[in-house]
Amino acid sequence: MGKYLRSSCKQQQQPSSPAAVASVAAAAVSSYSYLTLRSGRRVPAAAAAAGGSACRRRHRRGGRRGCAKNGAGSARACGARSPTSSASSGQRRRCEAVECSHGGGRAELSRSPPLGNSVVVVSGDVVSGERKSLKPNSCSREVAAEHAGEHKHNPAAAAAAGRRPPLSPPEAEIEAFFAAAELAERRRFAEKYNYDIALDRPLQGRYEWEPTVPNFDVAKDVTDM
């Protein structure tokens, strides 16, 4: 009878449906399988797997607050996986900070007013940030101003400068100069060669002049014959 009772208890304990068998097997496996964390604490594998999956889902959504709402095992599992996620989030934040800083720099550069003509080259040196202009004829104007000041202090010099002759002599003066030169050359040639170059005829003197070109009438008579 004892065997019968034991066998009946075993038959009653054995589940009939496959789902019940699977649940019983899972419970048996979970009761005997543990995971050892880095902290040295042993956590059931089923709880750690459930916590890790929930943590991964929440990390994909971008939040870490959901890990604290789970059990202690899931929170520790989350904490064990947190260094990589925190490093990635910190890197993203650093990248965003760098982008923001660069963007701000570009905005400041775009808002900064243009310098325009604030850069001037003076004798090979670049002077920035100062608006300067050089006049092209500043030296000549200074010299003219100095001469004007000298003329004011010396009236005689100013009068002499006003009486200066023009650069080109007048036409009458040129004609008189060449007329005198031609007359002197005519007299010299007449006295030396007894010939008047102005009238183109010989004069009385030591030389006897003969025409080299025949007369026009004589040449005409010769051609007619």
UniProtKB/Swiss-Prot annotation:
Disulfide bonds: none annotated. Residues 47-94, 130-169 are annotated as: Disordered. Residues 55-67 have a biased composition (Basic residues). Keywords: Protein kinase inhibitor. The keyword ATP-binding does not apply. Residues 143-153 have a biased composition (Basic and acidic residues). GO terms for cellular component: nucleus. One of its GO terms (molecular function) is cyclin-dependent protein serine/threonine kinase inhibitor activity. Residues 71-82 have a biased composition (Low complexity). GO terms for biological process: regulation of cell cycle. It comes from the Eukaryota. It holds the Pfam family CDI. The keyword Calcium does not apply. Coiled coil: none annotated. Belongs to the CDI family. ICK/KRP subfamily. This is Cyclin-dependent kinase inhibitor 3. It comes from Oryza sativa subsp. japonica.
